Amino acid sequence: MDDDNLDELVAHSPGPDGPPRVGSSELASDAEESSNGQSGDSEDDTGSEQDDDTDGEETEGLSEEEDPEDRSGSEDSEDGVEMATAAIETQGKLEASSVPNSDDDAESCPICLNAFRDQAVGTPETCAHYFCLDCIIEWSRNANSCPVDRTVFKCICIRAQFNGKILKKIPVENTKACEAEEEDPTFCEVCGRSDREDRLLLCDGCDAGYHMECLDPPLQEVPVDEWFCPECTVPGVDPTHDAAPVSDEEVSLLLADVVPTTSRLRPRVGRTRAIARTRQSERVRATVNRNRISSARRVQHVPRYLMSSLLDETIEAVATGLSTAVYQRPLTPRVPAKRKRKAGRRKKVLGRKKTRSRSSVKSKSGSTRAKKRQHRVRKTKGRKLKNEVTARSRIARTLGLRRPVRGTSMPSVYKPVDPSLGLMRADIGAASLSLFGDPYELDPFDSNEEQSADPPSPLSAKRRVLSRSALQSHQPVARPVAMGLSRRQLPAVAPEPSVEEAPVPDLLGSILSGQSLLMMSSADVVIHRDGSLSAKRAAPVSLQRNSVTQSREESRLRDNPQPGALPSESASGGFVGDRQPNSGLSCGNRTALCCLPARIAQTPVRSDPSLTPRSGLSRTLSDENRPSRTHSSSPQLNGSNVRVSSASTKIVTHSSFPSKNTASGLPQRTGPRRPDFSKLPRIPKIHRDGNKSTQDQAPASGHIVELPSTCISRLTGREGPGQPGRGRVDSEPSSRGPQETGSHTSGSRPPAPSSHGSLAHLGPSRGKGIGSSFESFRINIPGNTAHCSQLSSPGFCNTFRPVDSKVQRKETPFPLFSIKKPKQLKSEIYDPFDPTGSDSSPPSSSPESLGPGLLPSEITRTISINSPKAPAFQTVRCVTSYRVESIFGTEMEPEPQPPSEPVSGMLELLSKGSAEGTSDLEQEGLGEIEPTEIRGSTARTQRPPPPDPWDDEDEVSCTPFFGSEERTVTCVTVEEPGVLPSPDAPQITTHRIVEFRASSRSRSTSSSRSRKKTKKKKKKVAREHQRTRSSTRSGSRDRTSRSVSPVAEEHTRRHRAKTKSRRSSSDRASSQDRAKRRKDRDDRDREHRRGSWGHGRCRRKSRSRSGSPGSSSCERHESKRRKRRHSGSRSRGSSLERDRRHKHRERSRERMDKQESVTRSRERRRWRSRSPSLEHRPRRPPSREKRAHSPEKKGPVREVSPAPATQGESRQDGDHSAEPPVSEVSVLPEVVSVLPEVVVADLNPPEVPPVLAEPVAHVPEDLDYGESVEAGHVFEDFSNEAIFIQLDDMSSPPSPESTDSSPERDFPPNPILPPASLPQDSTLPTIQREVLPIHSEDISKPVPQALAPSDQSLLKQDTVEITTTTPSTPAVVPMTKDSPVLSARGWEAVRPRDAVAQAPLLRSRTLVKRVTWNLQEAEHSTPAALDRDPRTPLQRPQRPQEGDWDAEDRALIGFQQAPFSELPPPIHVLQESGLPDADPSQPPGAPRAEGLPAAGTLHSAGGILAQVYSPNMPPPLAQPSSILPYALVSQPSVQLILQGTLPLAGCGTAQSLAPVPTMPATVSELAVPTTNNSEERTATPKTAAEKTKKEEYMKKLHMQERAVEEVKLAIKPFYQKREVTKEEYKDILRKAVQKICHSKSGEINPVKVANLVKAYVDKYRHMRRHKKTEGGEEPPTQGAET
């Protein structure tokens, strides 16, 4: 644009401009003259006006329209051009903003080549060709035949839109005569007549006219493509006019450069004329162009509210021919121009030296014609000028000169003072990387020019000869003024879309920008999950600081939309925050607004690295810019950005990362927060410092409210640089830098602070966060921080929608929802769960509902959301954010205090968690951060919004999801450093802390938690939280103790309904959590010290535990280490189990991660609907899981010691007792982990059976599950939205759920055993998810609980089997649970179907699956089956595949659990598992507690059932039998999640032991390992040694069974074909199984098994041939198998 402006100025200055232009494009213009002699009809006007056109001042239509006018000889072109220039510019801008989509996508008018958008449409009555109403009416004035097929028509049908109804028909008016007189006619070179204009072809080379009939031979059809007259077709005649091609390209370039040239840019890309270029078409185009320009001018100031009526008026006016008046060039100069042309044109031409060459070339044509041609030649000259203009524009771009901002006459110098992405591209990438080798070629559009200059291609050669008018005939004329939509107003709102559009067709530019990104330091580039790259350092700080710099950036953005990273970054951040923030900031600068959006969009991207925190701010900026890119123009309405550095920075931080800018709101005001940068360097310190710093800032910011949203995004990993809040941090470095660090550290909660303001932003940011998660967490975790940040701003729409900033901005509330959050939103908004207190709160409370409120459930969902893009890291991030636990409270409450910063919110959450034990938080560094204050205030602030749902869940509901607030604390711990620069690292630490905290806090005092919750309640959910808190205290304690008392159960139920005992679990674990937190903090500190990778690892670990697949590996290891340490201190067998679980979880999670993404997306949707309560619970359960770890590792020793003793029976009743609960919590936390999911789903169900008071108490263990889930599952859950959704689904049927929940809770007395099966609990968390539905059914059936211990034992076995069966129908498991008596035969009966359903799956993990299912089924066979069958439908049926997976997992878990509880039962189970598993009683269609839960159950069902359901039975056996079904139901969900996308439940369960091992693993891998892990965990509950041994044994047993199954399946074909003998069959089976069982991976990959078997078969065959009796060494294939 600037180039154009410069050109314009030059053109207007005859002296200097003339010579330079002539000099630069003299040859071109001469050549053009000869070829385009007629090109400039109004040469006088063309002189300067064409320059204007060339400059693109007319942007979209002017240059093209001008030419058509000139060509047509309508002298209006001169004045019209000038007027058109302004009008077109305006119109172009309007078009750019209102019509950001490429015109190529839509049907376009054959005459003006403009897409049908809002203009009135006219169609000839005789054909179905659509034209703009004014185009066809103008056409009909001279010819009444269709321009396309020449069909004669007498009426024109007017329609309001393309394919719209016919509003009216108007007769054709033939005004041809009059106009012919006025206009300067084109005469046929052969006959010399100017009639029959519709058949008077114009040569595309010289513009000479020829009638079709006068040609030799005559043409029968009007050529649509280029047509050259006989003269021009002679080779060599016009080759000299090589400039013409450049002019063609230039035209495109100019059009592209002009902001309004949205449609032209596209035409440039590939639009070609749709109808023949005749005098008629040219005249019509010129007239239409003029009319539109003038009408655009007229409409320019019409209020928007009048626009709608304008459409009708326009139609009327056009129909009545009023627009013809406009067409008749109100500009008087035209008539004189025509006459001048005739009389003095030649002189002018001579004077220009153009006419002569033209006339000489075209001497043949009459004098009139010659004059015309000469004029055209002049036009060509103008074109030459254009050419020069192009060169000029290139130079201008190089110099940083840009089109002056509207309203100013001086060109703006946009050259950034500091290197920006654009500059870097130009200086580093574009210049040196220029594909054309032109060091001066800085603009991608210029590259087009150069291309056109290349004469090689035939098309180029032809184009070379094209006259300007011919070239223009391929370009759309001025866009019709959209009467329906106020085009002008739209532009005002988002005038810059055109800026983005220019880059759209710019493939080269994107490549170059990518090159520049690649050339940047890896530290400055963020790789998003979607594979996109963005510059960490947004625009140079100086750019943002200086309005001039910003302006330049804007121009550069406009001119060089090329910075791929920039636009994307811009789009993501800008769109989110730009609109909102910018509207206020730049609303005064509307003119600049058009340009500004682009500039700003780019500016954020190009923010000074110094200004932008490298990991935090720069990430934010780049992410922010990404939204801006999409939204480039409108989002970056940062007029202030351009005008004032402070404003710009402010805008950048605010508009780019509204969500992330939770703290941004405050920082936003502090535009020049350069200090932040100094803080930013601390990002590495974020581990602890980031937390503290964040907290400090968060309180100061007062954006705590938004913390949830930001944290959620961060947790989700969506809140990356793209997060509006974060991106905008640029100007709030001081406050936001730390906050940002803190917020990232907080688990990507920073956006939350601005969540209320950027609710929409949060959504988009989140969506985007998916893509930019890595950016945010650049330092510590690859993408979590950035992604989280983005999440807040771009709505995972970046992920998914990150690029579509506009959409994201519009959908900001939904981007999260639509992308990954759609489900999240559901969960958050899940009204059905509002009563449950699930995640309803987030919707109600969070700007994200999705903002702070969203945090709790959003964290879960967010992770889920993240999971798709970067499940591993994002999930882990989520875990990190588990401060959300507190944030749940905080999230709801901090929403009002977004300024506080997500970290603040997170800290507040931590503080809340630490409210129970501030010392803990402080130990973890959260306390320092402002544990109580921020937690109290932020938590209250944030919590109040989500509290509605969460309150329902229980006060713990906030924390339940995060394992009471434990998880949040953990996250905060990571942030503990409080150094804004170290948000990433702290986040990692925080995440880890969260996990441990969750379990510790969960076990910790319920009252402490209540206290914390009380604070939260005080803020927003004071009353509800208090009620919840009281519930949590009694209920959570009840849950913790699994109290049998009805009151406790009621509390539990209420908490389930509200928190689903999630918070309870947190409360239980709170004291232990504290100890655990300290350990975690130490561990995390340790890990953080290990290095930035350690940070990422820590964060990932914590997230892993919470279900983050990607991060799970690192975090997992660290978690394991931590857990081992904790286990050691715990002195229980559970520590070993837990360690094992961690390992298993890591493995399974890794596997799960792969499958997780798939399932996650599916399940996430389901979960999102239910996710609110379920997610919160699961989140909390993971927290609990961590707490369990902590207590189990530290405090647990004291608590677990009683627990193991009471595991079998004491737990049954001890569960309800406060102390036992605590100890149980230490062990049970994991069991509860499993149950929490169920509880979550059973929030309502808990109320059902009073008899199940104890089970209900156990269900609170679900809170413990929350602990487990929180640590392991929640992250997985988060990463696997599906599970949450499914849990929600389970939860969705409240009454069935309630019913199920109670029985499940009834069984929880059995889970008293879970102390012993704490590892199982870890598995159970997963089961719990699935269990929800089963739980409901189970609750309705307290029979299993009533069963004698022996019965329960039987149940346990049956449950294990049922677990196998459950895959096909989880409902069966509950039935089995209910009818333990039928256990043996029930599981057997079920087994057949299981075998059938499971058969395919069995290949991958047949044995384990079958066993678990059979046990579970047997257990729940009759009553449970009946009950569950009906109940199951309530639960959303999962995919059959999910069911299968669940079955497998269940089999494993049940198997392991049963053996674990009672070795004999395990063996029995194993044997049974060998049998086909099918639960006939369970309807195959019956949803498996969600199908997904079935999978989850697989892992933890066995352990949980054995532990939870055997209170009456021997602790180990009884629990599995009673709990298994319920766990099974839940577990399938987890398993499915593991397979697909939601390892949440399964991972959660396994998580407590092995944070997310299960979840990260691929589905198949995960299924087996997870199952094994679950089984191991299940076995672990007894004693560390026992658990370990049993776990090992069961694991080996299951592995062996599965190996045997797989080997048999693989060898069967060979044996059937008699390729191997019976002896060989046995040998191969023995060797292969041995080989497989000794594989290091612990996985049984059917493909590898098949390869191994085949290798053995080949070996034996070979040996047979050589008569070798020895089998020899195993084939190397075995190694592959492992």
Curated annotation (Swiss-Prot):
Zinc finger (RING-type): 109-150
Keywords on record: Coiled coil, Metal-binding, Phosphoprotein, Zinc, Zinc-finger
Comp. bias (Basic residues): 336-361, 369-384, 1009-1030, 1053-1063, 1091-1104, 1119-1129
Residue(s) carrying Phosphothreonine: 332, 1412
Biased composition (Pro residues): 1308-1317
Any matching Pfam family: PHD
Biased composition regions of type Acidic residues, renumbered to the chain: 41-81, 919-931
Gene3D superfamilies hit by this protein: Zinc/RING finger domain, C3HC4 (zinc finger)
Compositionally skewed regions (Basic and acidic residues) per UniProt: 1064-1090, 1147-1161, 1182-1197, 1574-1588
UniProt feature coiled coil, ranges: 1585-1612
Region annotation (Disordered) ranges: 1-81, 330-412, 444-483, 532-582, 605-774, 825-856, 911-1225, 1288-1322, 1419-1445, 1463-1496, 1567-1588, 1663-1682
Compositional bias annotation for Low complexity: 832-856, 999-1008, 1288-1301
Biased composition (Polar residues): 609-620, 630-667, 734-748
Zinc finger (PHD-type): 185-235
GO-annotated molecular function: RNA polymerase binding; zinc ion binding
CDD domains: mRING-HC-C3HC3D_PHRF1, PHD_PHRF1
Signal peptide: none
Positions bearing Phosphoserine: 447, 457, 845-846, 864, 867, 919, 982, 1000, 1135, 1201, 1368, 1379
Subunit structure comment from the entry: Interacts with POLR2A (via the C-terminal domain).
Protein name: PHD and RING finger domain-containing protein 1
Organism: Mus musculus (Mouse)
Organism taxonomic ancestry: Eukaryota, Metazoa, Chordata, Craniata, Vertebrata
Gene: Phrf1
